[in-house]
Each structure stands twice: as C-alpha cells, then as structure tokens.
C-alpha cells in the first residue's frame, strides 16, 4: 500500500506516463494476489500439501493487517501479498534501472538495495508469523514473474499511449 501511495504521489506531481503504468501494474498485482488467494483457498482448503505446505495462515498469525489488533487475520495466507508486491516492485525497478544509461556502480548499488528491501519484507512476514516460508516464497516467485511481464510490456503500452 505504501508503494502505491508513493507512486501515485509521483504521478500526480510529474504526470509521468511511466509512473502511471507502474501504478496500474501495482493495482493489477494486488488484485491478482487476491484472486490467487481465492483460487488457492478453493483448491487447498485446510489441507497441507507436501512442499507447498498449508494455504492458511499460521496459527500464531496476529497483527498482520493494517491495524495491529491482536487478532488472527481472516484473509488466506497463500501467496503472501507483501512478498508478491515487494518482489514485483523490486524486479520491475531493477529491470527499468538496468535499461537506462547510468553507471554500473549505481545500477549495482540500487539492485542490491531493492533486493535487500524485498527480502527483508519477505523475511519479516515469516518472523512475525503472518505467513509460512512457502507462502512467502510463492508470493516472491509470482511477484518476480509479474515484474518481468510488466517490464517486457512497458514499451509496447507506453508507445500506444504517446
């Protein structure tokens, strides 16, 4: 949510079509995550599947929503939405940065920072017991895939807008 607010603010301030494109994709990724949770909940239910683990949030999950109220969230755990969004934003941003003619040192530094931030967010979801490792990994993998897709479609879409 914070990423969406920052990108929205940047778009309002600059009217940059690339910011609007990223904002739209962040909303798409958020909605896809909610759709995937519904589909996976229908398939998994309360079952635990080898390697994939369980789809429900851990029993210890509390304070995982926007408001820390000490209650277990009612949303399904698979895939982790935080991991999904963090991986998407990190991968997409790294690909965009690497496509610009700036020094390799800056590209590498930004890639390290973005990757570390995404991994920190994913790690925090397991430390706070909001998700299992499998739920976080699935969110990260899906977010990364959508980041690559969004980057590869960027020039096609932006050319049609301009």
State each model region's role.
Residues 27-29, 33, 78, 131:
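Residue-level recognition of hydrophobic positions within alpha-helical transmembrane segments
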Residues 8, 40-45, 94-100:
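Short regulatory "switch" loops immediately downstream of catalytic or recognition motifs
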Residues 12-13, 28-35, 98, 122-123, ...:
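Hydrophobic membrane-targeting signal helices
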Residues 55-162:
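Membrane-embedded catalytic cores of phosphoryl/pyrophosphoryl-handling enzymes
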Residues 30-51:
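Transmembrane alpha-helix/helix-exit interface in multi-pass inner-membrane proteins
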Residues 8-32, 136:
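Interfacial segments of alpha-helical transmembrane regions
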